[in-house]
């Protein structure tokens, strides 16, 4: 039986589901290879857990990620969390887990912060409409 690990990551309204399996080192996000993923900043954010884990670990894995919702950077953060969790679960290596935690805790723990909702009396969550006294 083929070993397959499923993991997920969230950031704001973006949700990513990663599937990690034995392979040749291919990483795909929504069926697009990581090397072709745009913008470059998002691609660099997603590649962080791959660089920290090391080429010897990642070269033997295929990682397919499906991400929905949110914006570009929110999706990138959700993907990097899902990928990091998948690698940790696949390897069962505490050293890799510790390296991820030391670099950025959000690689393993989803960022639960949400947008503050708009309130009455103003255009946004905190701002108020201008008041005239005369």
Curated annotation (Swiss-Prot):
Disulfide bonds: none
Name of the featured protein: Small ribosomal subunit protein uS9
Gene3D superfamilies assigned to the protein according to its UniProt record, in alphabetical order: 3.30.230.10
Keyword Ribonucleoprotein: yes
Chain residue ranges for the region called Disordered: 114-134
Pfam family, one: Ribosomal_S9
Entry's Gene Ontology cellular component terms: cytosolic small ribosomal subunit
Signal sequence segment: none
Family statement: Belongs to the universal ribosomal protein uS9 family.
PANTHER family recorded: RIBOSOMAL PROTEIN S16, RIBOSOMAL PROTEIN S9
GO BP term (any one): maturation of SSU-rRNA from tricistronic rRNA transcript (SSU-rRNA, 5.8S rRNA, LSU-rRNA)
UniProt-listed InterPro entries: Ribosomal_Su5_D2-typ_SF, Ribosomal_uS9, Ribosomal_uS9_archaeal, Ribosomal_uS9_CS, Ribsml_uS5_D2-typ_fold_subgr
Species of origin: Methanosarcina acetivorans (strain ATCC 35395 / DSM 2834 / JCM 12185 / C2A)
Key words of the record: Ribonucleoprotein, Ribosomal protein
GO molecular function list: RNA binding; structural constituent of ribosome
Gene: rps9
Domain of life of the native organism: Archaea
